[in-house]
Amino acid sequence: MDETKIPKKLQSDDEENISLISSLPFDVDFDSTKLFKYQGCWYDDKTLQGVLNFQRGFEPQDTDIIIASFPKSGTTWLKALTVALLERSKQKHSSDDHPLLLDNPHGLVPFLELRLFTETSKPDLTSISSSPRLFSTHVAFQTLREALKNSPCKIVYVWRNVKDVLVSFWYFNSAKLKIEEERSILDSMFESFCRGVINYGPSWEHVLNYWRASLEDSKNVLFLKYEELKTEPRVQLKRLAEFLDCPFTVEEEERGSVEEILDLCSLRNLKNLEINKTGKTLRGADHKIFFRKGEVGDSKNHLTPEMEKIIDMITEEKFEGSDLKF
């Protein structure tokens, strides 16, 4: 492949980005999409444009909250929980004008590189007037750290068993393209995941770098495990509230505020909200494709024992020396 050949859709974009992208290592993923390797992660050209714009132009505020994750790791749920936590001082969870009843979690907590910075490094963010401002990202920690420019804003990271991530991504990709879930596509995705050549991959390094950051700076980086959010939601929600400096009071706990938020943000409830059944994101994706099962271990219904064994071996090798286990 010619490393200097840039897809036509980038020709009118920022020359600095084009010059940088043309110099990067590249490969192709499961559907032959060309990916470029930047700061240890793989990105398609359009996503990388947004990453570079964000990294160059973002002006963080110390009160900002960034929700970070590898794709399909529980991002939508974490966004909903965070919004509900911060909104509880303003209105009741049952209020008809609660933000979660009026917009999808991804509309309420916009992606930096996938929405706000896709076209420019200086987007108008004045419409995001709330304090703290809520943003989200899938970029690797080393890339995010550079963009934050030493700001002490809060970062909340959620991680999930990569086998469930893979299956969730397969379903999501099929729903987004409005095609059937073909086994051959899952097999190709599996190969890309194992090589690490997948958008935002490799997933293992993505998780490890945020985990290390949470150990080094626990005051500003919170590391949540999706499976623990599922098995002990009350404990993890209170932990999140403490981290965001909005802990539940004794009175709130006694009147059931924790349970109210968990019910409001449950997959069952979010999935059945009118806004999530019929709405679309600004990029044209149906809201409903962000809600499927959310079950722990669903990958066993789709991956062969050999595929599971291979992923387990890679995980053991990648996580050796850490306390991380799926």
Swiss-Prot record:
The active site is at 138 (proton acceptor). Its main location: cytoplasm. The keyword Transferase applies. It is found in: Cytoplasm. Sulfotransferase that utilizes 3'-phospho-5'-adenylyl sulfate (PAPS) as sulfonate donor. PANTHER family: SULFOTRANSFERASE SULT (PTHR11783). 3'-phosphoadenylyl sulfate binds at residues 72-77, 160, 168, 226, 292-294. Keywords: Cytoplasm, Transferase. Belongs to the sulfotransferase 1 family. The keyword Transferase applies. It holds the Pfam family Sulfotransfer_1. It comes from the Eukaryota. One of its GO terms (cellular component) is cytoplasm. Its EC number is 2.8.2.-. This is Cytosolic sulfotransferase 7. GO terms for molecular function: sulfotransferase activity.
